[in-house]
Amino acid sequence: MLLEYIDEVYKSVEKIKATQIKNIQEAAMLIANSLLKEEDSVFHVFGCGHSHMAAEELFYRAGGLACVNPILPSELMLHEGALKSSYYERNEDIIKLIFDRYDLRQGECIIIVSHSGRNGAPIEAAIEAKRRGLKVVAITSKEYKQKTFSRHSSGKFLEDITDIVIDNCGHYGDAVLKIKKDTLEISFSPLSTVLNTIILNMIEAEIVSIMIKKNLVPPVFLSGNIEGADEHNLKLIEKYKKRVKHL
């Protein structure tokens, strides 16, 4: 089954290449332009449950941009209680309290990652972000809207609210492999984290490319395990530490 999983990854990545490049390029351009407005401009990344790893993937990353502000509320992560995180992911009322902890500025961009796009917290995050004047990019699976209902009081899905939607080309239920034997039928091996991570790094790669074309030096962290990295990285940390809460 291990090779079948890789094959499923390839299938979805090829679908992303075939259908989502324009959306990814538009998202990168939107974010890049927002970063040029102020010397300390950042963009924000938010996700619930396992989707919070999207924010961690881009944050303080070797080869990644320093101007990334991850929104990492423990209530919506797994390490302080998986059941609690599932409860709060469906709760739209918590978002304003969470956003008040972070420096979110009008004209900046936020990437919201939700595989299902149906739960209260990520949908409310998009609504609240737009209310505060941010542009919203969503990474989600469009299959869910075709097969289930929204859990937000508005009845809307994440893709209905955002400025740019990127379909991660993942599947309803996330698991992509199946075994059926006698009366036993199991679906297993999720794809969403792999696909979301690929898309996020595609966005960052395009942002860096846009900055270089504008004769700017992208604020990219070096790996802490190569010589000279500490001095380079500390300069970037000094520049963004007032904007990036978790630095």
Curated annotation (Swiss-Prot):
Gene3D superfamilies named in the record: Glucose-6-phosphate isomerase like protein, domain 1
Chain segments annotated as coiled-coil in the UniProt record: none
HAMAP family: UPF0309
Organism: Thermoanaerobacter sp. (strain X514)
Name of the protein: UPF0309 protein Teth514_0240
Source lineage: Bacteria, Bacillati, Bacillota, Clostridia, Thermoanaerobacterales
InterPro entries found in the cross-reference section: RpiR-like_SIS, SIS_dom, SIS_dom_sf, SIS_GmhA/DiaA_subfam, UPF0309
Stated family: Belongs to the UPF0309 family.
Transmembrane segments: none
Domain SIS: 31-213
One Pfam family of this chain: SIS_2
Molecular function via GO: carbohydrate derivative binding
Any one biological process term the GO annotation gives: carbohydrate derivative metabolic process
